[in-house]
Amino acid sequence: MVNAFETFPHLLSPLKIGNVVFRNRMFASPVNSAEIISDGQPSLESVAYFERKAMGGAAAITYGEVDVDPEDYREGRYPREIIRMSNYNYARLASAVRRQGAVAVLELCFSGIHARMYTGGGKPAWGPVDMTLPFGGQVAAMPEEKILQIIDEFGNAALAAKKAGFDMICLHGAHGFGLQQFMSPALNTRTDRWGGNTENRCRFAVMAIDMIKQLCGQDIPVEIRISGSEIVKDGYGIDEGCQIAEQLDGHADIIHVSVGAINRFGAETFSRTHVSMFYPHGVNVEYAAEVKKHVKKSLVGTVGGLSDPYQMEQILAMGKADIIYMGRELVCDPEFPNKVRRGRVDEIRKCMRCLNCFAEGVGHGDLICAINPEIGREREVYRALPAPEKQRVLVIGGGIAGMQAALTASKNGHEVVLCEKSGELGGKILCEAEVPFKQGLHDYIRLQRALIAKSGIDLRLNTEVTPEYAQTQCPDVIIAAVGSDPVTPGIPGINKSNVFGAIDVYKNPSLINGRAVILGAGFVGTELAIYLKDFGIDAEIVEMLGDISDGGNSTHKSAVLDMITQKKIPIHFNTKAVEITGDGVRCQGPDGEAFYEADAVIHAVGMRPLHDEALKFSCCAKDFHMIGECRKAANILYATSTAYAASRLIGRY
């Protein structure tokens, strides 16, 4: 345990803007939970989720991306303006955040071309100029009266938010939303007072901020998010980003510096707005540092894959920023600020940047985290449950699922025995723990091991459980978490000495000398190709299907494709391996037979759940559960969620 106030003096120092006091420099960056009810308001589940983050000690909690245009907004699970409707759930959310000691912030946005970015047909979206989007959507240039209307809408929405109880307003002027569309010289080629030089291109945002101040008074701080650089080929760079910040300086109380313009349809910019595991932690900090050199009145915040409190403290101490924003880290561990303040930094659950949370939110409207099974379930987790009757629980298998099951059961007061047949906890995924871009996985396994060591769990390594052994333990409950095994494809030549499984290569990349062909373009195969490239090993991938298999995580797929493109890794889709030889792989592809030369062949074609191995324990206790990969070969998210669900209700019903 560290002395927090000596170790993190900047991170824990309070901040005051006008009459609004922030208890530290750790802010929750704007997100919405995708839990939206029919009239565009946050659901009660959302209210509970945001309150949980406030309970964790963050200074400010922001509910994000509320569209202000009543006529033209993004369709689907997005929050909408609060002027023309009852705002009771917004008021509940603000109250919930404030009663936990945090500042309640509402982020307002004008979508502009985002309203039609992925759809064709229908009425045109509004934007700086006329254009046709890649998916066929039309954009109409905004006349001045429409621009002035939206400025008024920003002011009116901010006033409604203030009346609903929000303490601060944030404007989304980054990531390709409407205000940034006007800031961008690549998109805004207008010749009137709303386009041309930097001052004109920022006029929309400046007038929106000033309107909010005019209607709400100087006692409500205003923050604006900007992209310090669009980081796309034809976009503006940090020099222009600093000029934009200079125009906003003194109008906004806080300039929150992100990067990117996701309306430009590049995987590389999405992987930086939502920093993927392939980029260093804090990769975007230098943009904020440059902006801070150019502003004199506004505070500057930084964001982007930050999860290490020591790094955060250094950023503030070096004067690179005044505020640290966290998005996914506070989904992964909402207690992060409290753990920093209490000196329990070794217990922080660090985000792996797997992007499951984003993919699930966009795809299904679920708020979820691969390694925090309680997120999105706050109303369930914190409701009163019957006290559990103490049970003796035997967990078989010490991988991701087994560790979580043991910890959850132990936390609920049960007597837990955790058996692992190998000499260490972690399971087969340990093979990836030393991969540089999987540092988050390594941190997570290390944390789970440490928590198990601190608990009262009876850990038995090098213990292979049989039904007979299980019965001698007299368990009330058995949780089978025995995992899965790699599938070995039935291809002629698969047993040759130059053929390896992906797990073996992850453990020992030196097995590969020269060129490699990888069979399978799931995440195991594609990430392995990226990893091998860092060792100077060229690999190409053969995939039977027509696309990368993403396992439901389309967002991480985008990040993987970004790296595949950057590293120039060939993928042969719709191609079947028919024979492995001593010098390569003979395949059948869309254009007929093809031969890919290789010194080594690596198979990564999936995992087989160990159903039978798990089911042999089904009659060894009165209650039996199968969790994780022995139930279904999936991912860490599935392993964690099934483990938590199985363990939480033990002894209660």
Can you say where each PLM-predicted feature lies in the sequence?
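Flavin-dependent oxidoreductase catalytic cores
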Residues: 1-396, 400, 404, 408-416, ...
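Rossmann-like dinucleotide/flavin-binding elements
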Residues: 310, 387-418, 425, 460-474, ...
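Short loop/turn elements that flank and shape the SAM/SAH-binding pocket of Class I
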Residues: 232, 465-469, 578-580
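Rossmann-like dinucleotide-binding cores of NAD(P)H-dependent redox enzymes
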Residues: 415-455, 506, 531-575
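Short acidic/histidine-rich motifs immediately flanking catalytic phosphotransfer sites
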Residues: 58, 252, 474-476, 597
